[in-house]
Amino acid sequence: MNRRRGILFALASVLLVSVAQLSMRWSMTRLPRPDQWLSVPSVDSVALAVVLAAIFAYALSMLCWLAALRDLPLGRAYSLLSISYALVYLLAASLPLFNESFSFSKSLGVALVMLGVITINTRPARAPELRSSP
């Protein structure tokens, strides 16, 4: 197990899934409902391309996640996924094209999530105990 490599793959997964989520949000505010994509005469091709790119980013994120699971204990790896919730909230609220707003309660929630991620990932990992056969 290579912890550093596992963390890098997990963070790459977080980054890709966050970009995918923001891209889908941007696209879906510019497109009709998905069931109307084939019947509407003019669908925004850029927004549709961004949706497809976001789906590809999700697939890459999953591959990075699988690679991370090879090198990290599940409890540590899974906690790193929480960073995506914080990242998406912060970017959506700070970038004008998303028209989202900051709130004290949401920001406090993000801070608590990040504190939890830091707490889980800064304490030393215990080696698994081997059980002897009876």
UniProtKB/Swiss-Prot annotation:
**Where located?**
Cell inner membrane
Q: Which organism is it from?
A: Pseudomonas fluorescens (strain Pf0-1)
Which Gene Ontology BP terms does the record give?
Answer: lipid A biosynthetic process; lipopolysaccharide biosynthetic process
Query: Transmembrane region positions?
Result: 6-26, 46-66, 78-98, 102-122
Keywords, A to Z, come to: Cell inner membrane, Cell membrane, Lipid A biosynthesis, Lipid biosynthesis, Lipid metabolism, Lipopolysaccharide biosynthesis, Membrane, Transmembrane, Transmembrane helix, Transport
Q: By its UniProt entry, which InterPro entries does this protein fall under?
A: Flippase_ArnF, Small_drug/metabolite_transptr
Q: Which GO terms describe its cellular component?
A: plasma membrane
Record-stated family: Belongs to the ArnF family.
Organismal lineage: Bacteria, Pseudomonadati, Pseudomonadota, Gammaproteobacteria, Pseudomonadales
What does the function comment of this entry state?
Translocates 4-amino-4-deoxy-L-arabinose-phosphoundecaprenol (alpha-L-Ara4N-phosphoundecaprenol) from the cytoplasmic to the periplasmic side of the inner membrane.
Gene name tied to this protein: arnF
A single MF term (Gene Ontology): carbohydrate derivative transmembrane transporter activity
The cross-references to PANTHER family, in alphabetical order and at most eight, read: 4-AMINO-4-DEOXY-L-ARABINOSE-PHOSPHOUNDECAPRENOL FLIPPASE SUBUNIT ARNF-RELATED, SMR FAMILY PROTON-DEPENDENT DRUG EFFLUX TRANSPORTER SUGE
Give the protein name, as stated in the record: Probable 4-amino-4-deoxy-L-arabinose-phosphoundecaprenol flippase subunit ArnF
Q: Pathway, per UniProt?
A: Bacterial outer membrane biogenesis; lipopolysaccharide biosynthesis
Q: Which residues lie on this side of the membrane: Periplasmic?
A: 27-45, 99-101
Q: How does it assemble?
A: Heterodimer of ArnE and ArnF.
- Do you know which HAMAP family this protein is assigned to? Flippase_ArnF (MF_00538)
Q: Which domain of life is it from?
A: Bacteria
What's its membrane topology? Answer: Multi-pass membrane protein
- Identify the residue ranges that face the Cytoplasmic compartment according to the record: 1-5, 67-77, 123-134
